[in-house]
Amino acid sequence: MKSKNGLSNARFWILVWGLGIAGQICWNMENQWFNTFVYAKIAKDPTIISWMVGVSATATTISTFLFGCISDRIGKRKVMASVGYILWGIFTIVFGLTQYLVRGSTETSSVLMAVGVAVVAADAIMSFFGSMGNDIGFNAWVNDHMKDSNKGQIGAALATQPVIGTIVGTVAGGMLVGSNDNYMR
């Protein structure tokens, strides 16, 4: 059965669950494991992590206001979600590649500063596009498809996804971190 916008019911729910779970797992991995990555692969300096948290929170807030307004004006939620998720994925990979900026050691303050800035910038850009894809694009798109007959089902799906994302992110992330002594120094 197709809705008034031409989206089949099955396709709608596949998108709600697929994109929703993907977004929640990504946010969980970022919030739970990226500080471990920085501490183990970049430097045992909590200042970098503090800067990551502050700058990425600012970037996410700016993204939310900027792309939220743009999305409301032009109404292209699918475009926002698609572009945001793709760029989010690319910059998540870029963030992981920052470990290769450390060539041997970060014992000199100038090297540590340069690598720290690169890590913070990669995290902020990644979070910026994550907010564009998930918070602005996906959540607004789901809201556009909400009506009285499906509002409870959508609410239940969206409420369940962070729990599933946290469980999967914690278990899968823990297995990856623990395998082959990835983060043990």
Show which residues each predicted segment covers.
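Helix-loop boundary and gating motifs at the non-cytosolic
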Residues: K2-T60
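Central cavity-lining transmembrane alpha-helices of secondary-active solute carriers
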Residues: I49-S71, I90-F91, I164-I167
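Glycine-rich segments within core transmembrane alpha-helices of 12-TM secondary carriers
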Residues: A59-T61, G152-V177
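Small-residue-mediated transmembrane helix hinge/kink sites in multi-pass secondary transporters
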Residues: F65-D72, A140, G173-M175
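A membrane-interface helix-boundary motif in multi-pass transporters
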Residues: R77-K78, S109-L112, M175-R185
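C-terminal ends and interior cores of transmembrane alpha-helices
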Residues: V83-M113
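Cytoplasmic helix-loop-helix junction between adjacent transmembrane helices
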Residues: D123-T160
